[in-house]
Amino acid sequence: MIDFGQIFQGSYASVLMAKAGADVIKIEPPHGEPLRQRAPPGRATTLPFAMLNANKRGITLNLKLPRGREMLFEMVRRADVLLENFGPGAMDALGVGWSVLHEINPRLIYATGTGYGISGPDRDNLAMDLTVQAASGIMSVTGFPDRPPVRAGITVADFMGGDMASLTGGPSITLPFLLPSSTSRADVVMNSLPASVTR
């Protein structure tokens, strides 16, 4: 599994896969994944980054350079799954979107986690756990009766998004492996944060 997961949603999906036995290769840009960058001065990483990237191998690739893309294409030839949770179109803009990768490996399962999906009127809106908690109504059932709504204590939309994408959810990464036609599997598995908390 090639893992471009970042922050919580993508990284949680791939760590669940790694803990279930998948060989996961975490790919970071040269400057590091955003969750790693939150480390205090003098530290190389954060505890959440370490927890969400356990059981994974890791490399850095610069997909803005031809050599970085060539290295990714070599990995894709042998991969079963590629997971990313960038904004819609980010992988296409780098020249490594689904249509390109599918040509290289027709059996590849391409899993994408976005804020609001890959189509529809809100696809280009950026999302984060807090805004999705508010928009989905989760915050209407948290907090205190005499005060404004309060966010849930954990990043529930992000973690539910990762769970939905990986092992237990509806359009999950594992589903194509379980189907009788799995010898010719190839699919785009899409999950959005609002769908994760309203299903």
Residue positions per predicted region:
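N-terminal helix-loop segment corresponding to the beta1-alpha1 unit
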Residues: 1-168
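Compositionally biased, low-complexity repeat tracts
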Residues: 28, 166, 182-183, 191
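Alpha-helical hydrophobic packing sites
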Residues: 131, 160, 175-176, 185
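Low-acidity, Ser/Thr- and Arg-rich intrinsically disordered low-complexity segments
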Residues: 172-174, 181-185, 192, 196-199
